[in-house]
Amino acid sequence: MANFDGQTAVITGGAQGIGFATAKRLINDGCDVMIWDIDEKLGLETSKKLNCQFLKVDQTDNKAVQEATDKTIKQMDKIDILVCSAGIAGPTYTTWDYPVEEWSKVFNVNVNGVFYCNKYVVKTMRDKGYGRIINIASIAGKEGNPNASAYSASKAAVIGLTKSLGKETASQDIAVNCITPATAKTRILDQVSQEFIDYMISKIPRNRFVTVEEIASLIAFLASKENSFTTAGVFDISGGRATY
């Protein structure tokens, strides 16, 4: 178990799902956590439950993310760790039937939002000479899921962003990595059909969902000082589904 005493973390989408489990894990390991989430009601409930701080942030708004970064620095003095967990699945359509507005919505949240968070937070890390960034991608970003081209392509973009930023910051003690989990049982599944859920489980040799706690354990290592060498990496947690 890593020791995060004296460290601070920002977790986007921290009010639920993977973000919530990660916030809980890091707090239990001694970290001071600030949750960024668009759901104010749930975010405030989570902050009380976990005894952490909360900011309502729409990560698709470039200016809002910049302001949230400034507010967080004022409140917490620094940001040692950034976990980008906020994301959406989007609807399930074939690529030729995919509504353009829905495609844009998925990319705005999953790609632009992650870019904004990485962009502004990493600047503060470069000033301090230390940081850990973990972006939540997906096995879909490596393999591509049928009827989920927007989600799959957006998560592939997160992998590419992670690799680029990791190389750009490698000369400092800043590690930028992403993880590619299989499906976890979170509210994001409310956005897709049961047929699609059954398909995803059928592709996992473990024959079950990954738990959010299992994902949080991997994130905790990547967020720790023990992860002192690996950067620009893609860490699989797909229960055997990944082919590379």
Region roles according to the model:
Residues K123, K167-S171, S228:
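Alpha-helical segment proximal to the catalytic Tyr-Lys
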Residues I204-I215, E226:
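A conserved structural motif in NAD(P)-dependent oxidoreductases
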Residues S138:
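Residue(s) in the substrate-gating loop at a strand-loop-helix junction
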Residues A89-T92, E143, T231-Y244:
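Short C-terminal tail/terminal secondary-structure segment
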Residues N118, S154, T162:
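Active-site helix of classical SDR
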Residues Y93-T95, P99-S104, L189, M200:
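Substrate-binding pocket helix/loop in short-chain dehydrogenase/reductase
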Residues W96, E143-S149, S171-Q172, N207, ...:
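Active-site loop immediately N-terminal to the catalytic Tyr-X3-Lys motif
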